[in-house]
A protein has these predicted regions:
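Low-complexity, Ser/Thr/Pro/Gly-enriched N-terminal "stalk/linker" regions
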Residues: 1-64, 101-109
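Aromatic-lined, polymer-binding surfaces characteristic
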Residues: 62-63, 67, 71-80, 99-301
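Structured alpha-helical bundle/scaffold domains in large eukaryotic membrane-trafficking regulators
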Residues: 81, 85, 150, 249, ...
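Carbohydrate-active enzyme catalytic cores, enriched for enzymes
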Residues: 117-122, 254-255, 278-423
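Amphipathic alpha-helical scaffolding segments
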Residues: 207, 321, 542-545
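Low-complexity, glycine/alanine/valine/leucine- and proline-rich hydrophobic stretches
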Residues: 386-387, 391-476, 481
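Extended repeat-based interaction scaffolds and adjacent low-complexity, acidic/S/T/P-biased segments
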Residues: 441, 448-707
Length: 707
């Protein structure tokens, strides 16, 4: 993408990108969308690798392709204050090569999509339907570009649009972030003088309060479903709704009071969320809808639009441009078309609702174009990310994550003590012990017949493996955290008490006052109850690489009930994808057993072995991060005891000899409440989680409407 404009390393020392680059990317994406547009532009049928669906599904998919790219066009138009270089019909030819300007192109599309007799008419808005989601994208676009597009439409077209949008009134939707969709539509109808339901708006804003957990974070519906929807939904739509209702429905004091509340939450959110991005621009690979990619930067732009400087303007642009470049430099938008995947096409991170146009929710990441060109977010010198300034350790109390980054490799890890996801599904995108900006969760058969299941504690029992039944409690602390969860081992209930703390391996070598750049070592402990006859497996981070992954295993039979002098250990090493011309970035993942203690059985009856399971997630495709994948894990034979205490070390980014060096200086003993740890003159406790307020196997997601 650098071909659009020379890099500006003076103003943008980290990314070289300026507003000009962002505009060029937007024009490239919009030009590509036009190639797949219907004759009157109301449908965009991006190519699909899968089989064709029903006619109704195809119509919805094409609406999605239109709506999400229309949002980008509206942001481009508004960011240019309605000015189309070359005149109304020429469009920004110098950047995007448009044959028809944005206003003319989309005026025709809006007419064709809503006229009753049009053969390009969009699907009706009905209960729990995808068209309502896409209608919200259209509403966002109409709102942002209102002075130049909506206001210029013939009254007939505005009436048709309002009639189509009115179909959402009184309808059911998913009881999660989707409650914001109908509310936003109703707010737009209110703002433009059409029939609407004010109570639906109020009900949606009231509903999301049920899910607010602090630090600016919301659960995506009932339970503990934390993910990037906080960034591109919960920290976006409330502000849009308030803007639409300015002078409607709410008194000035009420609107300002709500805005202060949402601003406070947004400030808290971006303060913590900025720590979830690696130095290479990668967001944390956790949660669903990862194919929306740079949509994750929307709240940083929204903060600037709202005058919130918790994250400085210079860091905002460095972060946002870094994320955008991360994906574009790795092939996410070949020929201007966003693929279904992460860097490129890859089905492993997709959900059933993803269609060819889905990735274009990334358009929300272009909110920064609404800022004037002379805004500090576009003119200030780029400032480094937190992980570029030293090792970081941050507690996000809302989702209950301990976030730690290492300056040496620029990788950020999120240790999970609160995200749980779907209650009835063992979803790796939500229920792993840890996530990172350089690894992706895996749950796939290995090439040797084993299982690739990263960052987990699970049990082999009978002919299968255990299923997570959900978190019962958890807390993130300044140096780690604790959680309690249940496992279903072939119908048997197993309770797992888990805790971890993070050590800086090289921290003691730092000069006084210097920034730590040391390797981050996780000391993990677990107490498993109800495991007689089961075979525990403890896995580390999965490494993905486009080159074959190296594996190594050491010391398969350590001593029991004491720290092993030569612990069982396993390591895998691969190479991260880098920008074109960059050298491959080496990345290793290692685990090492520190000690195991059994209750009510002779220790010599337990067998241990360390195994690096090497395999691809899917034949020929690997993971979203590489063609090959592997993870290190510790496997136990059948346990002769009903309770086992295990302590092990985990590291991402270092070789196994680092773990051995850490273990030499480590002393750990068990207590009824957890474990006591001493390491190089420091003392820590790793407490078990005492309170278990969360219900395992909660009800599935419900539907919502105000009635």
């Amino acid at each position: 993408m650098d071909s659009y404009s020379p890099l500006d390393t003076g103003q943008s020392a980290f990314t070289g990108w300026t507003r000009t680059h962002w505009e060029a990317v937007a024009d490239s994406l919009l030009t590509a969308a036009r190639r797949f547009s219907s004759p009157r532009h109301a449908k965009v049928g991006f190519p699909s690798a899968g089989p064709s669906g029903s006619a109704a599904q195809e119509a919805t998919d094409q609406l999605e392709g239109f709506a999400r790219t229309f949002l980008l066009a509206a942001l481009r138009l508004a960011g240019n204050q309605g000015d189309q270089p070359g005149g109304r019909t020429a469009g920004p030819r110098s950047a995007g090569g448009y044959a028809v300007g944005i206003v003319d192109w989309y005026s025709l599309a809006l007419d064709a999509g809503t006229a009753p007799d049009s053969d390009e008419r969009w699907p009706a808005l009905m209960d729990h339907g995808q068209p309502t989601v896409e209608a919200t994208a259209i509403v966002l676009g109409l709102h942002f570009s209102r002075p130049w597009l909506w206001n210029a439409l013939p009254q007939r077209v505005r009436d048709n649009i309002a009639t189509w949008l009115g179909g959402s009134r009184g309808s059911y939707g998913a009881d999660n972030n989707h409650v914001m969709f109908s509310a936003t539509i109703q707010a737009f109808l209110a703002a433009t003088g059409y029939p609407h339901n004010a109570f639906e708006i109020e009900a949606a804003l009231a509903r999301i309060e049920d899910w607010y957990v602090g630090d600016g974070w919301y659960s995506d519906g009932a339970g503990r479903r934390f993910d990037h929807y906080n960034a591109w939904t919960f920290q976006l739509y409330p502000f849009v709704i308030l803007d639409l209702l300015r002078g409607n429905l709410h008194s000035a004091s009420e609107s300002e009071g709500r805005r202060r509340l949402y601003r406070s939450r947004l400030a808290d959110f971006v303060q913590g969320y900025q720590h979830l991005f690696g130095a290479d621009g990668s967001p944390l690979l956790q949660g669903r809808s990862l194919t929306y990619r740079w949509g994750v930067v929307a709240p940083f732009w929204m903060a600037q639009l709202e005058g919130i400087t918790t994250v400085s303007p210079g860091r905002t642009r460095r972060l946002a441009s870094g994320v955008l470049r991360h994906f574009l430099d790795r092939g996410a938008a070949a020929d201007g078309v966003l693929s279904l995947g992460w860097h490129g096409s890859h089905a492993s991170i997709l959900q059933s609702y993803n269609a060819p146009g889905s990735p274009h929710w990334a358009s929300k990441g272009f909110l920064g174009l609404l800022l004037p060109a002379d805004h500090p977010a576009w003119t200030a010198a780029e400032e480094p990310l937190p992980v570029e300034m030293g090792n970081t350790s941050v507690v996000l109390a809302g989702p209950r994550w301990h976030v730690c980054g290492s300056m040496a490799d620029g990788v950020v890890r999120a240790l999970n003590f609160g995200s749980d996801g779907h209650p009835q599904r063992d979803d790796g995108l939500y229920r792993r012990l840890a996530y990172s900006t350089a690894t992706v969760p895996v749950l796939e058969p290995g090439l040797d017949g084993g299982l690739l299941r990263d960052n987990d504690i699970y049990l082999k029992a009978g002919n299968g493996t255990s299923r997570h039944r959900g978190l019962r409690g958890g807390v993130a602390r300044y140096d780690g955290g604790s959680s309690t969860f249940a496992l279903d081992a072939g119908g048997r209930d197993v309770v797992a008490n888990y805790a971890t703390t993070v050590l800086d391996e090289d921290a003691d070598r730092q000069r006084p006052g210097s920034r730590s750049e040391g390797v981050r070592i996780e000391v993990r402990i677990a107490r498993l109850t109800g495991v007689i006859g089961c075979e525990p497996v403890l896995s580390g981070y999965a490494i993905s690489s486009d080159m074959p992954v190296e594996t190594a295993v050491w010391a398969e039979r350590p001593a029991m009930n004491e720290a092993a002098a030569s612990p069982a250990a396993a390591r895998v090493t691969g190479w991260r994808r880098t920008a074109p011309g960059g050298l491959p970035a080496r990345l290793a993942s290692a685990v090492a057993l520190y000690r195991t203690d059994l209750t009510d059985a002779a220790p010599e009856r337990t067998v241990h072995r360390a195994v690096a399971v090497h395999g691809q997630c899917r034949a020929g495709s690997g993971t979203a991060l590489g063609e090959h994948s592997a993870l290190p894990q510790l496997e136990f034979g059948p346990l002769p005891a009903n309770t086992v205490h295990i302590a092990w070390l985990v590291c991402l980014g270092a070789e196994a000899d680092t773990l051995a060096r850490t273990a030499v200086d480590l002393a750990l003993c068990w207590t009824d409440d957890g474990a006591q740890l001493q390491w190089r003159g420091t003392s820590r406790v790793l407490p078990w989680q005492r309170e278990t307020p969360w219900a395992a196997d909660a009800l599935n997601q419900d539907v919502f409407r105000w009635h």
